[in-house]
Amino acid sequence: MKIIGISDSHGSHWDIKVPDGDILVHAGDFSSQGRLPDTLDFLRWFNTHPHKHKIFIAGNHDWLMEQDPNFWRIIKMEFPNLTYLQDEACEVEGLKFYGSPQSPRFFNWAFNRDRGADIKRYWDKIPTDTDVLI
């Protein structure tokens, strides 16, 4: 099985030459400012790839995903071939993936948490049997 990992495309995803593989993973920062048009453009692009499975998380630039915590429902309805993980797991062909957008505070970006107990409560949820952590 071949897993292709990309991240930090910041709205320039159309310029990326994505290699063939079985699973395509985008590890966040697919937009620069997390606006709805940018997010939808990324989702359309991500959905065009032939990889059997496509998994992604938000990054600290992907504000929409934090500001509208129910936006994932739209993703699931409009893009059923995409898997969005926000502090949750999925299993793909026997591999256990866990995705979390939470990151240590850096200025005032999306999904920033204070170091220590605040961020630890998210990271403590990561299952010990996770094969791929995003």
Predicted feature residues:
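Extreme N-terminal starter segment of soluble prokaryotic enzymes
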Residues: 1-3
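Active-site-proximal loop/helix segment associated with metal-binding centers of metalloenzymes
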Residues: 21-23, 56, 68, 80, ...
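Core catalytic region of metal-dependent phosphoesterases/phosphodiesterases
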Residues: 6-92
